[in-house]
């Protein structure tokens, strides 16, 4: 790959919304095809491999409930709606904590229950505290226990291989802190060449991680894989490379007897001496040649035994034919 001067990676825009971050980056110039390679690789890793904490286990202590198809006295939403809202709570961990992390909710009505009402241990922060969970009236008195676990991507509740205790409701693990990634390729000009490319990368993330942090993490994951391959190359045992000799098999189509008889004697590829002897005796085609016996050919001037053997061999190899013997 040719070294390209003037290549730049730039942050073109960054916006902070109430519940997410947005950033747009550009990288150019790139050799043709590299923008697709880089953009697609980063997108896949960003969406699938950035880990985080997510609420995955819920238990309604007060009032005591045992499944998601129930209702809660004093709450506008039923348990299913509250669980769906809990899955959208965004958590940031500022210090190392063991997974799972226990969280709690204690809330009396009337009022609105939000993510900010979740009580977290030291080092764990709810980064979207205004996120709506439920509306409570004056009869509501809620106590909920939650567990947040560490993971990546999306893990269905059925795949977590855990048997919850009675009263615990297991949720799907929506771990990925990256909401969406787009990439776009544009053509750019470098000197007289117009086939270079510019990669535009757009990243949307939850408030638990900034796009720049997610991008750095994804790059580290990719580099770790390539470094492993590079370091492993020296340990890979070289296998002997077999030399395969390809033999070309040429099959000539003989054709019908009429076609063969009309072919020129030049197609036998005889030596000049033998060919000239035949031509001087008016032998122009294969048919003319086969009309003569071996004794008749031997009477041709300068046509000796060596020439006869050559004609025999060529007729046999090329057309599967043979000369007639003389009459005894």
Curated annotation (Swiss-Prot):
GO cellular component, one term: cytoplasm
Domain of life (superkingdom): Bacteria
EC nos: 2.7.7.6
Role this protein plays: DNA-dependent RNA polymerase catalyzes the transcription of DNA into RNA using the four ribonucleoside triphosphates as substrates.
Protein species of origin: Fervidobacterium nodosum (strain ATCC 35602 / DSM 5306 / Rt17-B1)
Reactions it catalyzes: RNA(n) + a ribonucleoside 5'-triphosphate = RNA(n+1) + diphosphate
Protein name per the record: DNA-directed RNA polymerase subunit alpha
Domain statement: The N-terminal domain is essential for RNAP assembly and basal transcription, whereas the C-terminal domain is involved in interaction with transcriptional regulators and with upstream promoter elements.
